[in-house]
Design a protein with these regions (language model features):
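Extended, small-residue-rich solenoid/repeat segments and analogous flexible loops
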Residues: 1-54, 60, 66
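A detector of tandem-repeat and repeat-rich interaction/domain scaffolds
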Residues: 36-113
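Glycine-rich hexapeptide-repeat left-handed beta-helix
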Residues: 85, 94, 100-154, 158-159
Length: 189
């Protein structure tokens, strides 16, 4: 069981020589407001409507409730999950296999999966597993995250054809690819 921290605990945490507030792994669901330049350990959990100052850093496997807001230049480790309606300032970076609820919004120049200046869209309840599939457009091109798969759009299409050729799953995945390209192109600046 993770230690549950309160706002009072947050006041006792130390800052390192560069001014970063060191926050250990734990349950932060009782806290709504966090200052700038916090560093959180892995597996931290946060409640709904949390607000984080700019330049916060989160380790892997952190989870965030609905409508949380993050300042610019925040960094997130792999496999973090975000509730619906969360908003991120510009230049935020997201690790691999992060998941996002509906209606999340992203500032300019955010990066997902290590891609440069990426934007994304998701199609839910698709494929044999009926899971969410993420499509990204970045300076490096188009990419797809579907379960354990992460690769280029063309690699994904090849994998879909080899795995689901001639089935409804191939048809729906390829339709989702076409939709993603059209929508991402319309949003690309």
């Amino acid at each position: 069981m993770m230690k549950k921290y309160t706002a009072k605990d947050l006041e006792t945490f130390q800052r390192d020589e560069q001014g970063w507030l060191i926050c250990p792994s734990g349950d932060y669901t009782a806290i709504r407001e966090f200052p700038e330049k916090c560093i959180f350990g892995n597996g931290c959990s946060f409640g709904r409507r949390c607000r984080f100052g700019k330049c916060s850093n989160f380790d892997v496997f952190c989870s965030f409730g609905e409508t949380s807001a993050f300042g610019k230049c925040s960094n997130f480790g792999d496999v973090c999950s975000f509730g619906e309606g969360s908003c991120f300032g510009g230049r935020c970076n997201f690790g691999k296999q992060c998941s996002f609820g509906e209606y999340c919004c992203f500032g300019h120049n955010c990066s997902h999966e290590g891609l440069t200046n990426s934007i994304y869209m998701a199609v839910d309840k698709i494929g044999i597993e009926l899971r969410k599939t993420y499509f990204f457009k970045a300076e490096e091109g188009y990419f797809v995250r579907a379960g354990c798969f992460f690769g280029t759009l063309n690699e994904f299409k090849t994998q879909v054809h080899e795995t689901h050729g001639g089935t409804i799953y191939e048809t729906t995945y390829l339709m989702a690819c076409d939709l993603a390209v059209k929508l991402l192109d319309s949003q690309w600046k």
